[in-house]
Amino acid sequence: MTIAKMIDHTALKPDTTKEQILTLTKEAREYGFASVCVNPTWVKLSAEQLAGAESVVCTVIGFPLGANTPEVKAFEVKDAIQNGAKEVDMVINIGALKDKDDELVERDIRAVVYAAKGKALVKVIIETCLLTDEEKVRACEIAVKAGTDFVKTSTGFSTGGATAEDIALMRKTVGPNIGVKASGGVRTKEDVEKMIEAGATRIGASAGVAIVSGEKPAKPDNY
């Protein structure tokens, strides 16, 4: 598998414009990225632009704080699927995890998994920069129990992004059959290679073209 096919080509900034989405989807077609990862408002346009392409549309749920109710997250998933999303990246209820309310964390994830079942792949963002190692392990274990397809490090909107150490811990926790996505601060081919070596099977990056081409990102960011 090429590196491009492991990348979710990402544009999640709040000021993203239609022109930028059109560029993003054009680049996804050209380079063969796994997906474009966009905010829900851009799912329909992205799906239209990628009709017939190998790249699919990924969107974000309960993003970036994870503090919506399970019911709201489930509605977001259904709406996104209706608009053409094939993958959804949801943020867990981080406060509930901190409170050791594992039942709520699991119910929250299950609501998304159930809403997406058979229609969209689910990635669970645990926001590693806010968690202890014990919490990272517990979050991954709950996500697997709830039926996720992937666990993911970060939103890119908090205090830190992906590290090889966190990827290795997540991979060790979920085993070989669940995907692990590194996201947040992954900007170069060398960054990607470190993440893959640690156990990542998907990369979230706004610098997808620079990573594949070997050029420096025009404007580095966290996404």
Curated annotation (Swiss-Prot):
InterPro entries listed in its UniProt record: Aldolase_TIM, DeoC, DeoC/FbaB/LacD_aldolase, DeoC_typeI
Chief place where the protein resides: cytoplasm
Subcellular location: Cytoplasm
Enzyme class, spelled out: lyase
Pfam families: DeoC
SMART domains, A to Z: DeoC
GO molecular function: deoxyribose-phosphate aldolase activity
Alphabetical list of SUPFAM superfamilies matching this protein: Aldolase
Active-site residues from the entry: D89 (proton donor/acceptor), K152 (schiff-base intermediate with acetaldehyde), K181 (proton donor/acceptor)
Keyword vocabulary terms for this entry: Cytoplasm, Lyase, Schiff base
NCBIfam families xrefs: deoC
Protein name per Swiss-Prot or TrEMBL: Deoxyribose-phosphate aldolase
Protein source organism: Listeria monocytogenes serotype 4b (strain F2365)
Gene that this polypeptide is encoded by: deoC
